[in-house]
Amino acid sequence: MAKSRILKGDVVKVIAGSHKGQIGPITSITKDKQWVSVQGITVKKHVKPTNEDSEGGIKDIPAKLHISNVALQDPKNKDQVTKVGFEIIDGKKVRIARKSKTQIKTAK
């Protein structure tokens, strides 16, 4: 399994599936299954009432997308998606957008 170059907080665009074209920051990553959750992308799920939660019905639940179905949005040109590359700047390894050659700010 390859190491993911997309990190939590990166702004991504969905490139495949029913949510294709939607943009948002990554809220969580499951590394072993390679799933990501993107802010604002939800699925509707039918929930039956239980003893703890007496309210049933249709609820919006954050959708989990496979990491191959999202691509990093270019920080310089917001219309395009890009791949992630690495460069050594001042002795530190930093992530760069391959299309625009700009440094990607890491959200912490």
Curated annotation (Swiss-Prot):
Family note: Belongs to the universal ribosomal protein uL24 family.
Sorted UniProt keywords: Ribonucleoprotein, Ribosomal protein, RNA-binding, rRNA-binding
Gene3D superfamilies: 2.30.30.30
Gene that specifies this protein: rplX
Protein name: Large ribosomal subunit protein uL24
Subunit details: Part of the 50S ribosomal subunit.
Signal peptide: none
GO biological process: translation
Superkingdom per UniProt: Bacteria
Intrachain disulfide bonds: none
GO cellular component: ribonucleoprotein complex; ribosome
TM stretches of this protein: none
GO molecular function, one term: structural constituent of ribosome
HAMAP family in UniProt: Ribosomal_uL24_B (MF_01326_B)
Keyword Electron transport on entry: no
Entry-linked Pfam families: KOW, ribosomal_L24
Keyword Transmembrane tagged: no
